[in-house]
Amino acid sequence: KYNKNVKDCTNEEIYHGLLSWTKEQLKGRGYQEGKKKIYYISAEFLIGKLLSNNLINLGVYDEVAKYLKENGKELSMIEEIEPEPSLGNGGLGRLAACFLDSIATLGLPGEGIGLNYHLGLFKQEFKDHLQFETPNPWIQPESWLTDAGVSYYVPFKGFMLKSTLYDIDVAGYENKAIKLRLFDIDIADESIVGEGISFDKKDLLHNLTLFLYPDDSDDAGRKLRIYQQYFMVSNAAQLILDEATAKGCNLHDLADYAVIQINDTHPSMVIPELIRLLTE
């Protein structure tokens, strides 16, 4: 990647080289396919750092670690460079991530669907014995995200938002991969965040995918939460219908092509949204 010997590379260069190589290895293994697919919709996925997990599931972790050590590098130090995706917070997100790991390892056709949060929940910092909340950015020019080249339009009262779909490959242990599919808006604007994690909650055109679980202690925050959840499920429903019809589904037999699991109540609007789309 950098036309240099490993010994002469910085840890950052080695990390980005490993990132690119690992993504190619996952893509080369192919994806779990089948007529019927599991769609796991969740507001959060606490997937953790991916490099070491992917190397383990590809069966090459020890080999890579040995090669780096022979060249004066430590894989543990390389792993520290990777930013953790700010896509989840607690047990609900960890449950979702574990289900994806299981689906991939068992070799089942399936994928997770959620939102591509730019700044996560928040990052906790301490200064002068006081806690401060700051944004937790993680998206870099080179990351596990891959633009899927898929977009949908989601209607809201008075305006419409165009989505962009990004994929993260989830490796099954010694098996093919599945995809975590994350919807985003191209016009999300991180610059609207002020002190701490404060931002204009009414600016829905620019804040919709900034934060996981934005403050909902007022009407603007509650509206943002609802709009976030509807954006997620409308995109999910459109994706599910597109994939099913591409396989030959006539919509009357949708149950033969799709199984939908919703993680808690956040994605529950996918039920009326599917009905709305099917009746159009």
Regions found by a protein language model. Name each.
Residues K1-E280:
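A conserved ligand/cofactor-binding region detector
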